[in-house]
């Protein structure tokens, strides 16, 4: 190598140029692009056709069918009632029976941004509870009229299942709120000095700080519902002096990765939960917590947790555009995913489209087979964006209700299980979070407990399906590409009409 020169495009995008007798090359570390470029339905049409052909050749029985029609994959699936032979597994409500079933759908492995909303058409009497998945073998609740009971007790019935292409947004850069307006009297009430450790703040450079914490007193955090044992999270508070009173009023926090500890060969993690200042910016306060997205060793007690700890954090004074995602507390305590390490430039093949939520404690489904997890974390973002909750590929043990996480509210996750005897250990993945266009609407009419896809394709139950994330809206413009027959894996000259109208 003869010449090595360094060029800097910007402070955040260094470029290295070298040349030799074999030629010249340029390597650069580029800033992660925050823009969400919407790809049209036709961009994925070839992949969807291939997916259908594979499903036809490998899995579809001779008397079943699959087709791509008006931007959606429609599968005629055999639905079996897995709960009719087990006492208590069926629920009867208003001339309908609610039970459990499993189906096998086309499986998508790539690209990472493409998912499917699985739902039943509005006019279908057999309704599958919606979920978002990559396809494959899925299990969940469904409902059917009482008149169909004899059919399900003998064999089963065929029903149409729709797979609507869904592409969420990439998550923007995320931060945690830096509380900076609490009154000193309120601070003394919430953080009594005799219960708090002492923190000494050391400024490393610019707005990067070290916190040396001593004399920590740990306590159990007893939260959760009456259906389970208490929430096994341990917390400690601290208070100290803040060295920089010139800090701007509107700032955010960036926390570093969880700090790992070992006790008797068991690993666990600790991180900052919250951090804030009083109004005059002279005192800093905050809490530490064990990570609830990891399993906490049963022998871990308040006595054997560290009394002395060094933490690192960054105060962000210039939040990246175009749309920051602000959490009320440290999201690394509750979630996992590449999204939480988005500021690291050299991630290998990251997935910025989803966040995983883990069970914060051992979840018991006895006796109701239903459980609601409430996590004390909120988010704030642009008014036209929201976070959508859906399930995690769990091999049929339980389902997660598709619902919205409204900005400024705690995270509620509704889980259902086929068996009341199921126990999900702490740290089990229980939900996936997607960043989407605003989905709420004025349509509050809910015809059924299990939501269906409306005839015009605009709603799933009472949730609006935004064009920006659900690609079947392109089917009108792309009508020559929007349908293939059962006997062909390529678009036919005619349109194959479905029972669901295009949007």
Swiss-Prot record:
InterPro entries with a match to the protein in the record: Herpes_U10
Region (Disordered): 482-503
Family the entry assigns: Belongs to the herpesviridae U10 family.
Source organism phylogeny: Viruses, Duplodnaviria, Heunggongvirae, Peploviricota, Herviviricetes
Superkingdom field: Viruses
Pfam families per record: DUF570 (PF04489)
Name used for this protein in its record: U10 protein
């Amino acid at each position: 190598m003869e010449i090595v020169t360094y060029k800097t495009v910007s402070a955040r995008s260094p470029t290295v140029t070298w040349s030799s007798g074999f030629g010249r090359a340029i390597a650069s570390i580029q800033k992660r692009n925050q823009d969400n470029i919407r790809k049209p339905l036709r961009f994925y049409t070839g992949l969807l056709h291939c997916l259908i052909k594979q499903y036809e050749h490998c899995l579809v029985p001779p008397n079943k069918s699959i087709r791509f029609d008006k931007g959606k994959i429609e599968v005629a699936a055999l639905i079996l009632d897995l709960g009719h032979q087990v006492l208590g597994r069926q629920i009867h409500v208003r001339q309908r029976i609610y039970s459990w079933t499993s189906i096998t759908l086309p499986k998508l492995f790539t690209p990472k941004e493409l998912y499917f909303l699985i739902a039943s058409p509005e006019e279908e009497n057999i309704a599958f509870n919606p979920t978002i998945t990559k396809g494959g073998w899925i299990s969940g609740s469904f409902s059917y009229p009482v008149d169909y009971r004899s059919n399900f007790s003998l064999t089963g019935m065929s029903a149409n299942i729709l797979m609507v292409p869904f592409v969420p947004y990439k998550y923007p850069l995320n931060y945690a709120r830096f509380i900076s307006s609490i009154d000193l009297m309120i601070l003394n009430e919430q953080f009594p000095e005799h219960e708090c450790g002492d923190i000494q703040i050391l400024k490393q450079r610019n707005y990067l700080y070290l916190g040396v914490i001593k004399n920590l007193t740990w306590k159990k955090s007893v939260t959760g519902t009456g259906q389970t044992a208490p929430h096994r999270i341990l917390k400690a508070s601290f208070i100290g002096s803040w060295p920089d009173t010139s800090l701007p009023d509107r700032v955010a926090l960036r926390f570093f990765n969880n700090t790992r500890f070992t006790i008797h060969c068991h690993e666990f993690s600790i991180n900052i939960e919250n951090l804030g200042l009083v109004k005059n910016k002279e005192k800093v306060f905050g809490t530490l917590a064990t990570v609830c997205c990891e399993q906490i060793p049963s022998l871990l007690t308040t006595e054997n947790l560290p009394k002395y700890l060094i933490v690192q954090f960054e105060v962000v004074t210039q939040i990246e555009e175009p749309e920051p995602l602000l959490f009320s507390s440290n999201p690394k305590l509750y979630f996992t995913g590449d999204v939480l390490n988005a500021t690291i430039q050299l991630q290998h093949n990251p997935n910025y489209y989803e966040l995983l939520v883990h069970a914060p404690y051992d979840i018991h489904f006895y006796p109701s087979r239903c459980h609601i997890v409430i996590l004390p974390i909120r988010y704030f973002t642009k008014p036209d964006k929201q976070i959508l909750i859906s399930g995690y590929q769990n091999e049929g043990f339980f389902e997660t209700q598709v619902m919205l996480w409204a900005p400024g509210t705690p995270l509620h996750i509704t889980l259902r299980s086929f068996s009341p005897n199921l126990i999900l250990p702490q740290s089990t993945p229980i939900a996936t979070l997607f960043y989407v266009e605003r989905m709420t609407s004025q349509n509050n009419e809910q015809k059924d407990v299990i939501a269906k896809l409306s005839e015009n394709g605009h709603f799933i139950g009472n949730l609006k399906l935004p064009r920006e994330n659900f690609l079947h809206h392109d089917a009108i413009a792309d009508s020559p590409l929007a349908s293939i027959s059962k006997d062909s894996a390529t678009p036919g000259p005619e349109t194959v009409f479905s029972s669901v109208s295009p949007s």
